[in-house]
């Protein structure tokens, strides 16, 4: 079976590696154009492109696939390339570009998507973040047949994964990426044998996992400690949850919710020492923050952080 693969970040690169290791022929990879990254803002290839080049897989990086969009000539060139590349199916994982119907219609066996949620629970761009943020106890991977709607297509395979109490988006991402790689291989093997069956998605229980905005990073300490602890895990590694102390943004990377009386105003630092970490009053309960970072600094354990940043008796806004 010949596969065109479309994906961009590390999540997708893990799936591409799994397909390559399983022996599937991959005549073409689509990925987003190189982007400026790092302190020097040098152009950097996506994780998918890096894997493809290392394994001598041809790569295309169209800026758009929409024939009716801002770049119709680029889109037409991409359509022509897809039609000229012999393949059976397209596999899509966190590609980042909209696939119009004109693209979905090209692969003889359609387009399969690896989605990091138990659909229809979280449709959209940030299902891992949102699952942690709201306190879901489990998530998983859905392999689905793509259609024009956003993550609305028929479900082909689904497998759940528990969300651990200390999972961050980073750790859960890695677990789901591995699971997604295993499942897309399984799905394609079943497709080859004609054993893959589709189940329509129910609309009941569908939620939209909106892309994480940088503005969400600043915590409202009037919320409960439980809510805030989940946000800190959900926003690790991006965008990094933060509080503002005397005008300075301080990122919180690790924290636990504590039960305590509400005798302090929200944001008040109750204690800041090597033994307790940094304990901050919230609207309900308190946060024990154990890893912090100031602008331009490194992520540090609380015991190290407070040596260079006085927090005792301070208040976060």
Curated annotation (Swiss-Prot):
One of its GO terms (cellular component) is cytosol. Its EC number is 2.1.2.9. The keyword Ion transport does not apply. (6S)-5,6,7,8-tetrahydrofolate binds at residues 117-120. SUPFAM superfamilies: FMT C-terminal domain-like, Formyltransferase. It is an enzyme of class 2 (transferase). It catalyses: L-methionyl-tRNA(fMet) + (6R)-10-formyltetrahydrofolate = N-formyl-L-methionyl-tRNA(fMet) + (6S)-5,6,7,8-tetrahydrofolate + H(+). Attaches a formyl group to the free amino group of methionyl-tRNA(fMet). The formyl group appears to play a dual role in the initiator identity of N-formylmethionyl-tRNA by promoting its recognition by IF2 and preventing the misappropriation of this tRNA by the elongation apparatus. Belongs to the Fmt family. This is Methionyl-tRNA formyltransferase. It comes from Herminiimonas arsenicoxydans.
């Amino acid at each position: 079976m010949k596969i065109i693969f479309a994906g961009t970040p590390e999540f997708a690169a893990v799936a591409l590696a799994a397909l390559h290791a399983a022996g599937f022929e991959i005549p073409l990879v689509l990925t987003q154009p190189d982007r400026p990254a790092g302190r020097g803002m040098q152009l950097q290839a996506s994780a998918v492109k890096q894997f493809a080049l290392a394994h001598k897989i041809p790569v295309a990086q169209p800026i758009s696939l929409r024939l009716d969009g801002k770049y119709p000539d680029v889109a037409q060139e991409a359509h022509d390339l897809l039609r000229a590349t012999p393949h059976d199916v397209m596999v899509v994982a966190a590609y980042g570009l909209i696939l119009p119907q004109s693209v979905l219609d090209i692969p003889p066996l359609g387009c399969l998507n690896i989605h990091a949620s138990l659909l229809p629970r979280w449709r959209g761009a940030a299902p891992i973040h949102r699952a942690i943020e709201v306190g879901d106890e489990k998530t998983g991977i859905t392999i689905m047949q793509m259609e024009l709607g956003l993550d609305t297509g028929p479900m082909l395979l689904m497998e759940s994964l528990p969300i651990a109490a200390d999972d961050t988006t980073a750790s859960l991402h890695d677990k789901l990426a591995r699971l997604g790689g295993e499942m897309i291989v399984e799905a394609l093997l079943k497709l080859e044998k004609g054993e893959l069956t589709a189940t329509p998605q129910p609309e009941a229980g569908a939620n939209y996992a909106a892309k994480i905005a940088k503005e969400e990073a600043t915590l409202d300490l009037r919320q409960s400690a439980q809510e805030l602890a989940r946000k800190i895990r959900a926003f690790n590694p991006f965008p990094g949850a933060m509080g503002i102390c005397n005008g300075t943004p301080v990122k919180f990377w690790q924290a636990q919710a504590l039960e305590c009386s509400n005798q302090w105003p929200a944001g008040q630092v109750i204690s800041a020492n090597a033994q307790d970490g940094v304990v901050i009053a919230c609207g309900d309960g308190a946060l024990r923050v154990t890893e912090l970072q100031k602008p331009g600094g490194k992520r540090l354990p609380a015991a190290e952080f407070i040596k260079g940043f006085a927090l005792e008796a301070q208040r976060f806004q």
